[in-house]
Structures are given as structure tokens and as C-alpha cells.
Amino acid sequence: MGKPHPLKPGDTISLVSPASFLTPEQTEGGIKYLTSLGYRVKTYPSTYRADGYLAGTDAERADDLTAAFHDPETQAVLCARGGYGSSRLVPHLDFDSLAKTEKLFIGFSDITILHAYLNQRGLPTLYGPMAFTFGYEREQWVYESFADVISGRSTIPTAAPKGDAVHPGVAEGIVVGGCLCLICDLLGTPGQIDMTGKIVLI
């Protein structure tokens, strides 16, 4: 399995909602930021749909996610937000076919579930900001780091504030993990994350 290619101006980012919905104002804020970077943005019905707490039925959200991955004009698939609902898509998705597209997949929080299944199939993904993130004003480093990483200018968010290390040192390896409650939900399932020899992000 190959790695997703860095994005370049003019590339298309498909905006999908596998979990909870966004308000139109939040969605437009995310689209405005992405287009300011020079990217085209493609939306799907679930991008603007609301069905209770979710962005449509499980089948509708899964169909949109599948369509985005298999769209030949799309280079990256960006989740609108997390919240709840991604785990309900698992029975509706063919992760083998999604991973083979080698599209850049981006999201965090509830999207942990989808990362886990795609990573199992050899597709590296980006645990990072979503459209929801850019629907509000954020610190400048959030915008800079996101733009640098998706374009391949940096593999780490160099502009982010530095934390304090409990045990300083250097580690190299494959990073896995995500939202702790979702990591726990995956235990004992086919999507359980293999952490052997990995760097675990929580």
C-alpha cells in the first residue's frame, strides 16, 4: 500500500460528515479556510444534513464517505466533525476498497474508529483538524500547522506549542491511537489497534 500524496493548490478536498452534523455557518467557515489555501472543496449531502445528532442515517453517511474516497477528482477526504456515529458506519463500509484509493484521510475524536480500520489495511491517515476546527477562530499555529502538514512542507506540527516531557528522549516509529474512549471501544473487535512496537497517541 502506498502513502497519500501531499496536496498542492488546485487539488480537491471532499468534505464529509461520518458522525455528527455541522451548522451551515460552521461548514462555510471550514470551506472558506480551505479555499483560502488554494484547494477546491467538494461537498456531499451529509455535509449539510442533520438527522437528530447525526449528519443523516448510517447508510447515507457511509455512502457519502465511500463516494468521496472513490471520486477520481478527490485527493483528500476531510471529516466535518467528530461527535458520535462513526462506529455505526463500520458494517456499511468496505475498508479494503477505501484504503486502496490511497486518499489522504483527515479527522480526529470520533473519527478514531475509521482511522483504525484504514490503518489496519496499510493506509496512513492524518489525525488532525476538521472543518469544525476552522469554523471558529483559532490560534494561528493551528492554521499554519495544518497547512504545512497536508502540503508536505512538514511531517509534524512545528508551529504547535511545545509540551513538557516526563522522560525526555527521542523515539521513532509508527504512530497509532486517537481518542481514548474509542480506542477502548475497539478492544475485542476486528478494529482493535495493534500497539506492539508502536508509538501510541492518546
Model-derived features: positions:
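ATP/NTP phosphate-donor binding region
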Residues: 1-73
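Active-site beta-loop-alpha substructure in enzyme catalytic cores
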Residues: 180-202
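Conserved anion/nucleotide-ligand pocket segment
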Residues: 124-188
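N-terminal glycine-rich "phosphate-gripper" loop used for MgATP/nucleotide binding
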Residues: 76-87, 92, 108
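Structural motif
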Residues: 13-14, 40, 75-76, 104, ...
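Short, acidic/small-residue loops that bind anionic groups at enzyme active sites
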Residues: 95-118, 124-130
